[in-house]
Structure formats: C-alpha cells, structure tokens
Swiss-Prot record:
It is a multi-pass membrane protein. The chain crosses the membrane at residues 1-21, 37-57, 69-89, 99-119. GO terms for cellular component: plasma membrane. Belongs to the fluoride channel Fluc/FEX (TC 1.A.43) family. GO terms for biological process: cellular detoxification of fluoride. It comes from Pseudomonas putida (strain ATCC 47054 / DSM 6125 / CFBP 8728 / NCIMB 11950 / KT2440). Fluoride-specific ion channel. Important for reducing fluoride concentration in the cell, thus reducing its toxicity. NCBIfam families: crcB, PRK14234.1. One of its GO terms (molecular function) is fluoride channel activity. The gene is fluC. This is Fluoride-specific ion channel FluC. Keywords: Cell inner membrane, Cell membrane, Ion channel, Ion transport, Membrane, Metal-binding, Sodium, Transmembrane, Transmembrane helix, Transport. The keyword Metal-binding applies. Na(+) is not transported, but it plays an essential structural role and its presence is essential for fluoride channel function.
C-alpha cells in the first residue's frame, strides 16, 4: 500500500508541476489567452487517459502502482476541472460570452474526442 501511495503522490507532483509550468508559460506569452494553458493540459490529459486506458486493457498485468501513478496521480494532477470552470467564468464576466461558450464547447467535445483518439491508438 505504501508503494501505491508513493506512486500516486509522485505522479501527482509531476502532473501538477507540468500543469503549473504550462499555464504560467501560456499566461506569460499570451496574457489575453490565459485559458489556453488549461485547455491544452486538459486536452492532452484526455488523449493520454484514453491511450493509457487502452494500453492497460491490453496489458492487464501492468503493476497497479504504474497504472494508478499515471492515471490517478499524473493525469489527476495535470488536468483540472476547477481551473476550466474559473477560466470560463472569467471570460463571461469580462463580457467575452461567445469566447466562453466556444472554450466550453471545445473543452468538452475536444476532451471526448481526445480520449476516444487515445483509446483508438491502442486498437491497431
């Protein structure tokens, strides 16, 4: 159990640091498009969860520490629904309602498509 907790913790730290770096880099380079960093990590996370889920379906003997460390830890730290929600509210409050609706649509539909694409990549 300690190895499992350590794997999830290490994955969470890595995913969180990558999200922090990505969103800060985007905000520094494109301050008007602050939401793009959250969108990027969420879409990449969706692609990766589909890919990892598909790989682990074909390799069910992969250690539980590896599966949990990557999916629960790393991807849980990388992706974020709360930041997505805050970004959407900020866009709406600044009067950018069409952009907020587009961002929400791209996030949800893009996330579903990215997850499907990741899973599909394991089926060839």
């Amino acid at each position: 159990m300690i190895a499992l907790i350590a794997a999830v913790s290490a994955g969470g730290i890595a995913g969180t640091l990558l999200r922090f770096a990505t969103t800060n880099w985007v905000a520094a380079h494109w301050p008007r498009h602050f939401y793009a960093g959250t969108l990027a990590v969420n879409l990449v996370g969706c692609l990766l969860i589909g890919l990892l889920y598909g790989l682990f379906l074909h390799k069910p003997l992969a250690p539980v520490e590896l599966r949990a460390g990557l999916i629960v830890g790393f991807l849980g730290g990388l992706t974020t629904f709360s930041s997505f929600s805050l970004d959407t509210v900020r866009l709406m409050e600044s009067g950018q309602v069409p952009l907020a609706l587009g961002y929400t649509s791209i996030s949800v539909v893009g996330g579903l498509l990215a997850t499907w694409a990741g899973l599909s990549l394991t089926r060839f």
